[in-house]
Amino acid sequence: MTVKFINAKEAASMIPDGSTVAIDAFISFCLADDILGEIESRFVREGHPSSLSVVNVAGIGGDGKDRGINHFAHKGLMRRFLCSNLSLANKIYPLITEDAFPCFMIPQGVLSHMMRAIASGKPGIITEVGMKTFVDPRIDGGCINDAAKACDERPVQLIQLNGSDCLFYPAFSIDIAIIKGSKADKKGNISLEKEAMHLEQLEMATAARNSGGIVMVQ
């Protein structure tokens, strides 16, 4: 494992176009906002990184103005957005309604377990969670806008297991994981001792590493 100590601007420069980027936070708690801000600045300046497939487990709207996922409110920056809610993502709403990219919502618990599934190399999550809700493929399949309904990359499938209907949420690779910690040592071990919450930091980092991706920690 290669460990590098770099600044947020350098971290943003390492993200290729078309990457799948997973971001861990809960509203503004444990939010690596310096990195997200530098991603925005680089996109405004250079037009890169573009066409990112962005995943966040919980809502990361930050302050409801400029922080969190609001940094990504630029046409062309995202090509797909998978989340569990859009709490305080006020700048993102217009892009969703304008169909700037497909937006999908699936249950927060499923996305949380998905990080562990990806980390352990499982094919995905099989569960009844989401059945008979708008997440069910027989209803809306978690589609939030028309762009999502027209997209072939659906986050959930209806399957049968032992004669019963279930939902299958397929796993995916993570190219970049962005998390926040309190301290780091020279070996890359991260402490969360001053963070407000223990979220999916470990699972998301492991998922990215086992996908051959990069873990960025602010």
Show where each model-derived region lies.
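Conserved alpha/beta enzyme-core scaffold
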Residues: 1-218
